[in-house]
Amino acid sequence: MADSTSLINKRTKGGWNAALFIIVVEIAERFAFYGLASNLITFLTNELGQSTATAAKNINTWIGVSCMFPILGAFLADSILGRFKTVLLTSFIYLLGIVMLPLSVTVVARRMREKVFFMALYVMAVGEGGHKPCVMTFAADQFGEANAEEKAAKTSFFNYWYMAIVLASSIAVLALIFIQERVSWSLGFSIIAGSVVIAIVIFLIGIPKYRKQVPVGSPFTRVAQVMVAALKKWRLSSTRHHYGLCYEEEDEHKLESTNSNQVYLLARTNQFRFLDKATIIDEIDHNKNRNPWRLCTVNQVEEVKLILRLIPIWISLIMFCATLTQLNTFFLKQGSMMDRTIGNHFTIPPAAFQSIVGVTILILIPLYDRVFVPMVRKITNHHSGITSLQRIGVGLFVATFNMVICGLVEAKRLKVARDHGLIDSPKEVVPMSSLWLLPQYILVGIGDVFTIVGMQELFYDQMPETMRSIGAAIFISVVGVGSFVSTGIISTVQTISKSHGEEWLVNNLNRAHLDYYYWIIASLNAVSLCFYLFIANHFLYKKLQDKDDDVESER
């Protein structure tokens, strides 16, 4: 009776009907986030009086913290609360921070404005910690692995999920920035708060349609057990026929009997062989009941191997994420000093150029999903056309090339400023059309279509089934670390250039050398790309175990 009820629930719940509710929620939430982040440097420099470099570092630090909290949120989701409850709880925390924003520029006294504003930002960061890693995985959970149709739909889901995020950010950039700069910051922040309220209401409406995964205990404990068990048996021979396969029968029973979660057995691999010792049954294990800190199943060991394989990939993506931070910082200040007029009366706000990234992505993702993938699939026979790692690699190359272009455009802007005697006139517009910035914004969009979506898919698909919120948190955390690295690069460049008598990143960009800074980023990206290509070439993809399999892997 319970099995038939479970089957009916799986048929009536989940799928696109459920995922669409969560996608709409993400659109509203991302509208709020990008409505704040995309023009934050303007608020910090113009309203709070911070220098360009200080504002850039503050933004990078805030984004970095926002992207590190998800590790805690993912732990709570996978081990204690479950993804649904975590998303709901942290959405209210996020709303609290958002509500504090308009209060900081209206009710709060001017001398306290900066403190309250940054308090609001970091309360938002706490809320982001639970929302970010769980909402995407919760949406992806609505597509099962056992159903072939739903499994195929999941590949398209990641494309359209990112497309929804970009749609939200584009609307925010086009609408909110004009309100913030032309009407008032308090109205702009109030609209942001309203969008979060709408997101929570929509999320609650969709409750009857959701498939909810049950938390299975601390994933970190399972990882620690494998490490400890392998260390305890480091002297033993890891001969293949000594594996403790009897414990896999327990996992198979778990797979058949669990109604809410589906746990699949992993194929054994030859990588990280030292961990295989955790599965060996020695004399102590024969004579006593199983101690999970001495004896682990093959499946548990393979789960740890999945995580270890992703660590080098994670490291190789840090510089790409450091590059992304330029979009919300120096790109804006660069555009603010160029000719942005249309006709005689209309001037484009610098932050509005970020919508070009969104438009590029909104055009490319449907083309990628409906044209590129089917065409390439005929050649590669891969269900996604190209692998996640190949997709990421293309994006990394585009990002590296883009920073070279950024440096060239900035070098030309500086030359025009010198030719017109504007070196010491930072408030004067350099007579160079802001359309010169189009290539770098378009290339950011192209790079994101390949790398960001590829990262989301890789860190979801290659994580153990019970640790997918952790996988999303790991993906988000690399963005956070990239933001911290960007802050470190800015500080290092400031220190070194100042010691040589010519500071590269001063408030007056006509006296700065933003072009040199961009080329340093390009060089670091090139090194990172080479490291990534080496790691990706030796990466083993996850493969599920067939009944008669011994050791399987897919490169």
From Swiss-Prot:
User: Where is it predominantly found?
Assistant: membrane
Location in the cell reads: Membrane
Q: Which InterPro entries match?
A: MFS_trans_sf (IPR036259), NRT1/PTR (IPR044739), POT_fam (IPR000109), PTR2_symporter_CS (IPR018456)
- Tissue-level expression: Expressed in roots and flowers.
Signal peptide annotation: none
- What's the protein's topology in the membrane? Multi-pass membrane protein
The reply to whether DNA repair figures as a keyword in the UniProt entry is no
- Which Pfam family is one of this chain's hits? PTR2
**One Gene Ontology MF term:** tripeptide transmembrane transporter activity
GO CC annotations, alphabetized: membrane
Q: Which domain of life is it from?
A: Eukaryota
Residues modified as Phosphothreonine are: 86
Q: Which residues cross the membrane?
A: 18-38, 62-82, 87-107, 116-136, 159-179, 187-207, 311-331, 348-368, 392-412, 435-455, 470-490, 516-536
Q: Which UniProt keywords apply?
A: Membrane, Phosphoprotein, Transmembrane, Transmembrane helix, Transport
Q: Which family does this protein fall into? A: Belongs to the major facilitator superfamily. Proton-dependent oligopeptide transporter (POT/PTR) (TC 2.A.17) family.
PANTHER family according to UniProt: OLIGOPEPTIDE TRANSPORTER-RELATED
Q: What is this protein called?
A: Protein NRT1/ PTR FAMILY 5.4
Organism the protein comes from:
Arabidopsis thaliana
